[in-house]
Amino acid sequence: LSDLDNGAFYHAERVNRAGPGLAGISEANGRIWNGNWSVDWRSGGQTLRATDERFELNFALHSEKAPIVHGENGVSQKAAGAGRASHYISLTRIATNGQIELGGKSFDVSGTAWMDHEFFTHQLEAEQVGWDWFSMQLADKTELILLRIRRKDGSVDPYSAGTFVDANGGQTHLRAGDFTLQPMDDLWKSPASNARYPIRWKISVPRFGIELEAETPLASQEITGRSKLAPIYWEGAIALAGRRGDSSIAGVGYLEMTGYDRPVELGH
């Protein structure tokens, strides 16, 4: 949860084994739960509830577009070799309203959300040290997902990829050569991990006439303090401005960066 007005960032994570009162899923009842966190889809949309000692979320969600299945033929290849891939599904534009409780106050909110679900079958290659992932909602009702995988020598991995979603929900798979993600000189140094993250980017997708700049309204959105074996993430809100063809365009999004403190060892 990013509180832009007060410059605060909140993160909560919970791991439970399956069992009564712990965690589970019931397709028959249309419900997923993890303690008192839950998603309920019996109403046709989704109802999301999550409570932490610092904040509480209660949202009603309804997807405006069909799910997107990334990759080619439903497989998002991440590296050379059998099994080095994922299945990756997104709901890229979800009408959302509800309440956020923070600091003893309740706020009514509405907006547009995004949901991702990705599961891997194997680890990355040793030469792949991290990634930069962008999810972007543009004002013309299109969405853009771009993944830049970084290699140890500083080059961009050929398995970098993306997806463009048009206003009607049609999707186009993008290969590494179809787009450019270029970090600019603005860096934020984390006091927790000492990692230096690029917090301004240039984004180019010539195939769709898209030229954007992305920057974050809140530099401190790093997720640390998990297992020592887990990657450290910078994961937070970004604002977008630029052009699509001859028209100016704006948008919002989310940026995830890993491997800036040490090489990621996902799956090893």
Regions found by a protein language model. Give the residues of each.
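Structured soluble/peripheral alpha/beta segments that form catalytic or ligand/cofactor-binding pockets
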Residues: 1-268
